[in-house]
């Protein structure tokens, strides 16, 4: 993941010191692009160990259209606990918007299903997008979406995806985001009988929290290792029928984890 290390180095070199909502403060740049060729390996960070179970279970949670952390907690995943209310709900975030986007007329739109239909029937469409940024629901969300819009592209029977992320916690969040969308591309490619192509990532406010800067400096001293491979062990009848046990990461040999405090 040389792209990730290069990004950290740039933020440290030219980033702007900014105040932020959490009170922690950030070193920030505006506008950045990265590209990952999924044919060359699964882009799971090797310069520190990532908790792959959290990544997979969170993605499956989104795809269920779920917005209550009960499913995550049942599977010993706590990454959303800080934002849940007393009932375990986090508001109409990713899962709600992906699977049940509410219209002013009271209808609900399943954006993921619509994309799957287009990929199978009209793969040259330029309208294969999913948005999590529902302006009418923002005030109801415990944490508004950071990764807000993604688009699919098919050429030569190969599936690529581009993500726009308005706000990016580079040290803690970004490794999860890259891996999560790469898994999603693999899943959708399998369901649509396509090969995997590129994952393109675009960030808006791309930042290191001030309490992560020294940790990031430690991380960039580590030389990236060979990327692992992602294998999906079976093909369910539907994108929404995958389970954690269907995924296998082969050849993941990361450096030890570097723990950082999350800013809320």
UniProtKB/Swiss-Prot annotation:
<dbReference type="GO" id="GO:0004799">
    <property type="term" value="F:thymidylate synthase activity"/>
</dbReference>
<dbReference type="GO" id="GO:0032259">
    <property type="term" value="P:methylation"/>
</dbReference>
<comment type="pathway">
    <text>Pyrimidine metabolism; dTTP biosynthesis.</text>
</comment>
<dbReference type="Pfam" id="PF00303">
    <property type="entry name" value="Thymidylat_synt"/>
</dbReference>
<dbReference type="InterPro" id="IPR036926">
    <property type="entry name" value="Thymidate_synth/dCMP_Mease_sf"/>
</dbReference>
<feature type="binding site">
    <location>
        <position position="263"/>
    </location>
    <ligand>
        <name>(6R)-5,10-methylene-5,6,7,8-tetrahydrofolate</name>
    </ligand>
</feature>
<protein>
    <recommendedName>
        <fullName>Thymidylate synthase</fullName>
        <ecNumber>2.1.1.45</ecNumber>
    </recommendedName>
</protein>
<keyword id="KW-0489">Methyltransferase</keyword>
<dbReference type="GO" id="GO:0005829">
    <property type="term" value="C:cytosol"/>
</dbReference>
<keyword id="KW-0963">Cytoplasm</keyword>
<feature type="binding site" description="in other chain">
    <location>
        <begin position="166"/>
        <end position="169"/>
    </location>
    <ligand>
        <name>dUMP</name>
    </ligand>
</feature>
<feature type="binding site">
    <location>
        <position position="51"/>
    </location>
    <ligand>
        <name>(6R)-5,10-methylene-5,6,7,8-tetrahydrofolate</name>
    </ligand>
</feature>
<dbReference type="GO" id="GO:0006235">
    <property type="term" value="P:dTTP biosynthetic process"/>
</dbReference>
<feature type="binding site" description="in other chain">
    <location>
        <begin position="207"/>
        <end position="209"/>
    </location>
    <ligand>
        <name>dUMP</name>
    </ligand>
</feature>
<feature type="binding site">
    <location>
        <position position="169"/>
    </location>
    <ligand>
        <name>(6R)-5,10-methylene-5,6,7,8-tetrahydrofolate</name>
    </ligand>
</feature>
<dbReference type="InterPro" id="IPR000398">
    <property type="entry name" value="Thymidylate_synthase"/>
</dbReference>
<feature type="binding site">
    <location>
        <begin position="126"/>
        <end position="127"/>
    </location>
    <ligand>
        <name>dUMP</name>
    </ligand>
</feature>
<comment type="similarity">
    <text>Belongs to the thymidylate synthase family. Bacterial-type ThyA subfamily.</text>
</comment>
<dbReference type="InterPro" id="IPR045097">
    <property type="entry name" value="Thymidate_synth/dCMP_Mease"/>
</dbReference>
<feature type="binding site" description="in other chain">
    <location>
        <position position="21"/>
    </location>
    <ligand>
        <name>dUMP</name>
    </ligand>
</feature>
<keyword id="KW-0808">Transferase</keyword>
<dbReference type="GO" id="GO:0006231">
    <property type="term" value="P:dTMP biosynthetic process"/>
</dbReference>
<dbReference type="InterPro" id="IPR020940">
    <property type="entry name" value="Thymidylate_synthase_AS"/>
</dbReference>
<keyword id="KW-0545">Nucleotide biosynthesis</keyword>
<comment type="function">
    <text>Catalyzes the reductive methylation of 2'-deoxyuridine-5'-monophosphate (dUMP) to 2'-deoxythymidine-5'-monophosphate (dTMP) while utilizing 5,10-methylenetetrahydrofolate (mTHF) as the methyl donor and reductant in the reaction, yielding dihydrofolate (DHF) as a by-product. This enzymatic reaction provides an intracellular de novo source of dTMP, an essential precursor for DNA biosynthesis.</text>
</comment>
<dbReference type="InterPro" id="IPR023451">
    <property type="entry name" value="Thymidate_synth/dCMP_Mease_dom"/>
</dbReference>
<feature type="active site" description="Nucleophile">
    <location>
        <position position="146"/>
    </location>
</feature>
<feature type="binding site" description="in other chain">
    <location>
        <position position="177"/>
    </location>
    <ligand>
        <name>dUMP</name>
    </ligand>
</feature>
<comment type="subunit">
    <text>Homodimer.</text>
</comment>
């Amino acid at each position: 993941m040389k792209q990730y290390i290069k990004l950290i180095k740039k933020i440290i070199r030219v980033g702007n010191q900014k105040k932020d909502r959490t009170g922690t403060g950030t070193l920030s740049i505006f506008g950045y692009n990265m590209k990952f060729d999924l044919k060359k390996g699964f882009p799971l960070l090797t310069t520190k160990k990532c908790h792959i179970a959290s990544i997979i279970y969170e993605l499956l949670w989104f795809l269920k259209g779920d917005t209550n952390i009960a499913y995550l907690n049942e599977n010993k995943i706590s990454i959303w606990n800080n934002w849940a209310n007393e009932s375990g709900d986090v508001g109409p975030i990713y899962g709600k918007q992906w699977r049940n986007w509410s219209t002013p007329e009271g209808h609900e739109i399943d954006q993921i299903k619509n994309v799957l239909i287009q990929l199978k029937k009209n793969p040259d469409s330029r309208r294969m997008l999913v948005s999590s940024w529902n302006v009418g629901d923002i005030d109801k969300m415990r944490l508004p979406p950071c990764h807000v819009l993604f688009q699919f592209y098919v050429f030569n029977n190969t599936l690529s995806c581009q993500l726009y992320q308005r706000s990016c916690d580079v040290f803690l969040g970004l490794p999860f985001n890259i891996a999560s969308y790469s898994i999603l591309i693999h899943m959708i490619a399998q369901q649509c009988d396509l090969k995997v192509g590129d994952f393109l990532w675009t960030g808006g406010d791309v930042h290191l929290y001030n309490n992560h800067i020294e940790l990031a400096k430690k991380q960039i001293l580590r030389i990236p290792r060979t990327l692992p491979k992602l294998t999906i062990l079976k093909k369910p009848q539907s994108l929404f029928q995958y389970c954690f046990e269907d995924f296998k990461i082969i050849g993941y040999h990361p450096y030890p984890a570097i723990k950082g405090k999350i800013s809320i």
